[in-house]
C-alpha cells in the first residue's frame, strides 16, 4: 500500500524493443488470475499513492523509461523514449526524445481520432503533480530544484488553481517529440524517477473529460500501455483487457546482466508480441488464508505468500514437498521496503519535542518486541530494520548501529525518570501531570493485524502503558493519517527507485499531509535532507544519512520494525515470470498454459 503503502512505490512495467520477429498478439482466450490483499484507491498516475493502484496503473500507462526485464542489478532501458536521457550541465539538464508512433488507447475523449503520444503529454502530466487540487504526493521530487517551479507553486497554492498553459522554464517541450527538464542544482539519479509510474503520460483531453472536483481521473484511466480497464467493482474486482492499440513490443531475450536461469524463463516466449495474455482478472481478497486457499485450488496463477502462512508452505527458503510435487515454485527476495510504526508528532499526547514527550516515544519504541514480531507473526520472513533505507539500495549503511532496540527494562526506567508513573494503583501509568495516558494504535480489521494488536498489548502491559486500538479498513485509515487524525499507525514504504535518498523525505516538514505521516517538523533535519539531495551516492552522502538516522532515533517519530521478504508462489502453468525488486505484477510478460482439470 502506498505505502503499503506506499512509497511509495516503482511499479513500472518494463519493455524490450527489437528481438526476434513477432509471432502473435495477445491471446484473448487466456486470463491471468491475480489477487490483491488490499483494495485499490484509483488509477490516476499523478494522484495515486498506494501500491495496489500503481500495480494496475503499470499495466495501463507508460513512463518514459523502464527496467531491463532480465538484467540484475537493474538497468534502465527506453520505454516510450527513443533513447536514454541526454544528461548535461553536470546533472542539471535532462533532454529526452519521445518515440513517435505510440498511441493512446481509443476513447470517446479523443472524438474518434487516433491520439499520438507527444512530449507535451509528459509536460502536461508532470505539471499535474504541481496542481494543488490534485494533491499529488510526488511534488517533493521537484520542489526547491526544478527551474521556475517554486514561484509557480506559490502562485498556484495561493490561487488554489494551476495554469497548465503558463510557461514553466524547467519543464518544456522543445518540439513535438523532445522533452527537456532543467534543475537548479544537480539531480543525481533523477533518470530512475522517469521509470516510475507516477511519471506516466496522461492525455489532457481525458483529464478534462472525466476529472472530478480535485482534477483527478481515478475511474477513467486511458493510457498507452499494454492493457486497458474493462470493468471495475471498487474494492472487489478489477478486469483488464489487452489494448488493441498497443505498439509493437516483444518479449526480450536475456542479455548482459541476466542470470543463468533466465534462458529457461524466456524459452518459447522471446520474440512474441506483448502482451501475451488477453485478460487480467484481479480479485481483492483481504484475508491471508482465503488468498492461499484460492492459490491452492488453482484459482490464482501466482500469489504473494502472506508471512503468517509461511510455515504452511515453506521449508526454509524452498517450498515444502507437497507443493514441489505440484510444480509450485517460490520466488524470494528481501524487498526494497521498510515496515514501521509512526507517532503523530502533532498529537497532544505522544507528539511534541520536549524531553518528556521524546522519552515517551523512545520508551514505547524500546518496549515493542520487533524480534517476536518477526519470529512469531512474520515467521522469520523479515529481517530487523536498523535505518530507514533498506538493504540493496544506494545509501544503506551496513556499518550503522542503531542507538537502541528492544529493551523493556530501560524503557521502564526512562518512563520512571520522566514522571510517567502509576498514581492510582490500577497497573497503568499516568502522564507526568497526573492526567490519563492511553495510547491509541490504528489497525486494520484482518487477522494479521489482530495478532499484532495482541503483541502490542502484551508489550505495553509490560511497561505499564495502557493501549487501545482504532480499527478500520486501510483506505479509511490512510485518509485519517493524511489529515493528522491518528495517534499511531503501522505502515510500509516500498521504493520506486534503487536509491535510498527518498526514505528520508518521509521526515521532511514540507511533506506533511503526503509522505510525512509522523508530521515531524525539524528544520535541522530538513537542512540535512536538502544537502543530501545535492550529493551523488558515496561516503559524503552516507555520512549525512547516518546523521539523519541519529536524529530519527533521537526524536523517535518512527519505530523501525523490519525489512520484509517477498515470497511469490507461482503455479507450474505460469510462464515468463521474473521477480524484480522495484517492479511487481509485470503482467504483459506473463503467459499461462492450459490449467489441469
Question: What residue ranges belong to the model's regions?
Answer:
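Positively charged n-region of N-terminal signal peptides that target proteins for export
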Residues: 1-4
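Sec/Tat signal peptide C-region and signal peptidase I cleavage site
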Residues: 20-25
